[in-house]
């Protein structure tokens, strides 16, 4: 009876089969039509083009969905495909273990929407106000005095994957044997320049963020430390570490001042990832960038400004 799951069909053939399978299921015609379209499409993106390959291995199926250039990528659109698979398993396959696994992927896919609201992502009007091209921001950085706090701030949000307002109390360790006294720190020696972030918004999901400073960023940091030796990456006028809120407030004011228009750290993160996507960065690299920014690949798509 289940032979159809393991056979290869054209999209139209599989569409007809799925419509027939759902014929007597008490669901709306709209839902049935959606499943009959989305599931065959999704199967066509897989290395093994069968329904069984799709339903048995959600990780591979979702990776293929994320990689295909044939659809618009957003959590909302992915939800339609994942929901179709969940419905097929719930009503047709009726495998509780498989359903539980797919429901977990469905839940993860839905998180970016809630995360977007929690992050207070900019509105369309705010986007327009902060629509400074990435290259223009980089140009402004290079025009600022070497070693200045504003130049270093822009450097840490453009020359490395930009995190949230998590640099507020980032300790600088110049000896690898030193034990950090803060959750967030940079190990800066003659042979190593490593950022470690343990206190950040999504730490329960991602545990920690680790990143290696680029050569250009190392030069920016060294110039700043030569000009103002200190224990922390960014400090107040009396050389103390910022609180998260005070750092965010200072950073937004500093960015707005030097860029001569409204700018926030969130907007800068949007501009960074939009630039990467516009540069046709590979899906694999985009996933790595998302991890270093402390969020999911789907959340990264929310960050893209068209």
Place the predicted regions along the sequence by residue:
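Short, polar N-cap/turn motifs at the start of nucleic acid-interacting alpha helices
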Residues: 261-262, 282-305
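Active-site/catalytic core of tyrosine-dependent DNA strand-transfer enzymes
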Residues: 210-268, 272, 277
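Flexible interdomain linker/hinge and immediately adjacent N-terminus
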Residues: 97-140
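Non-catalytic DNA-binding core/recognition domains of DNA-processing enzymes
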Residues: 23-105, 266, 270
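A short, glycine-centered helix-capping/turn motif at helix boundaries
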Residues: 147, 156-181, 279-283, 293-295
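Conserved tyrosine-mediated DNA breakage-rejoining catalytic core shared by Y-recombinases
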Residues: 170-215
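N-terminal DNA-binding module of tyrosine recombinases/phage integrases
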Residues: 1-23
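Basic, Lys/Arg- and aromatic-enriched nucleic-acid-binding interface segment
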Residues: 130-166
């Amino acid at each position: 009876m289940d032979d159809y799951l393991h056979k290869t069909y054209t999209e139209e053939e599989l569409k007809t089969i799925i419509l027939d399978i759902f014929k007597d299921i008490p669901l709306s015609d709209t839902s049935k039509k959606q499943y009959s379209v989305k599931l065959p499409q999704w199967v066509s993106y897989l290395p093994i083009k069968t329904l069984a390959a799709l339903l048995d291995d959600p990780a591979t199926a979702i990776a293929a969905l994320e990689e295909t250039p044939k659809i618009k990528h957003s959590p909302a659109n992915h939800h339609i495909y994942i929901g179709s698979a969940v419905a097929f398993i719930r009503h047709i396959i009726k495998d509780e273990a498989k359903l539980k696994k797919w429901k977990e992927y469905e839940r993860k896919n839905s998180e970016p929407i809630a995360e977007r609201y929690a992050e207070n992502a900019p509105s369309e009007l705010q986007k327009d106000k902060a629509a400074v091209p990435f290259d223009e921001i980089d140009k402004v950085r290079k025009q600022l005095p070497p070693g200045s706090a504003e130049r270093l701030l822009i450097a840490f949000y453009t020359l490395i994957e930009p995190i949230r307002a998590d640099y507020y109390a980032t300790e600088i360790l110049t000896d690898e044997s030193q034990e950090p006294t803060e959750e967030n720190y940079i190990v800066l020696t003659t042979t190593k320049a490593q950022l470690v972030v343990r206190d950040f918004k999504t730490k329960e999901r991602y545990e920690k963020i680790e990143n290696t400073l680029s050569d250009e960023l190392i030069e920016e940091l060294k110039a700043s430390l030569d000009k103002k030796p200190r224990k922390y990456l960014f400090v107040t006028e009396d050389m103390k570490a910022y609180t998260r809120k005070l750092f965010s407030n200072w950073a937004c004011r500093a960015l707005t001042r030097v860029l001569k228009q409204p700018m926030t750290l969130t907007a800068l993160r949007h501009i960074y990832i939009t630039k990467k996507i516009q540069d046709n960065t590979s899906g694999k690299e985009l996933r790595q960038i998302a991890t270093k920014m402390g969020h999911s690949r789907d959340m990264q798509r929310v960050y893209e400004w068209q």
